[in-house]
From Swiss-Prot:
Chemical reaction(s) catalysed: 2 a quinone + NADH + H(+) = 2 a 1,4-benzosemiquinone + NAD(+); N,N-dimethyl-1,4-phenylenediamine + anthranilate + 2 NAD(+) = 2-(4-dimethylaminophenyl)diazenylbenzoate + 2 NADH + 2 H(+)
Key words of the record: Flavoprotein, FMN, NAD, Oxidoreductase
Function description: Quinone reductase that provides resistance to thiol-specific stress caused by electrophilic quinones.
Protein name: FMN-dependent NADH:quinone oxidoreductase 1
Lineage of origin: Bacteria, Pseudomonadati, Pseudomonadota, Gammaproteobacteria, Pseudomonadales
Residues the record lists as binding FMN: 9, 15-17, 95-98, 139-142
Enzyme's top EC category: oxidoreductase
UniProt EC number: 1.6.5.-, 1.7.1.17
DNA repair in keyword set: no
GO molecular function terms noted in the UniProt entry: electron transfer activity; FMN binding; oxidoreductase activity, acting on NAD(P)H as acceptor; oxidoreductase activity, acting on NAD(P)H, quinone or similar compound as acceptor
Cofactor descriptive note: Binds 1 FMN per subunit.
Organism: Pseudomonas syringae pv. tomato (strain ATCC BAA-871 / DC3000)
Amino acid sequence: MNILHLDSSILGDHSASRQLSRDVVEAYKSTHADSHVTYRDLASEALGHFSAASLAAAGTPVEARDAAQQQEVDNNEATLQQFLDADVLVIGAPMYNFSIPSQLKAWIDRIAVAGRTFRYSEAGPEGLCGGKKVIIVSTSGGLHQGLPTGAGHEELLKALFAFIGITDLQFVRAHGLAYGEEPRANAMAAAKQQIESELLAA
């Protein structure tokens, strides 16, 4: 069982999503003794944003690439392969300005690859990544779930993973974290209880 654990919060030890994503991984490991965890901190070891240079590197024949292009291709392939090798993904995904962190979006741009994680056919797009499980730790200062202001956060992630064929998607939520000490404590406690009841009991 290969677990890919991704954090994207810029808040370090003060991050709620980091704390809860660790809890999710530990809970999953406790019920899956054969688990192997690969950890990636997308904030401290950020991928560059996908660019024209990224496309040019991928489209340049191997023998014609310069060193920078080859490094770009190698980094992108390593990121994609890390995703493909994972059976379970645990993703810390805080809301920043009504969406996900740009660091997480940069990772998504490396794993949404035509011919590798999805393809187009006469019937339309087809996801190629079925069989994986994704657990998303969703945190936010406000309360946006089900509102237009939340469309670029959880709904974006749902659409992306569905597009590449992943239907086993679970959210652990701690929202309203900026509403004061008591609401924050209550939201964190509820998320921890969800982890215990849904993951430790699995």
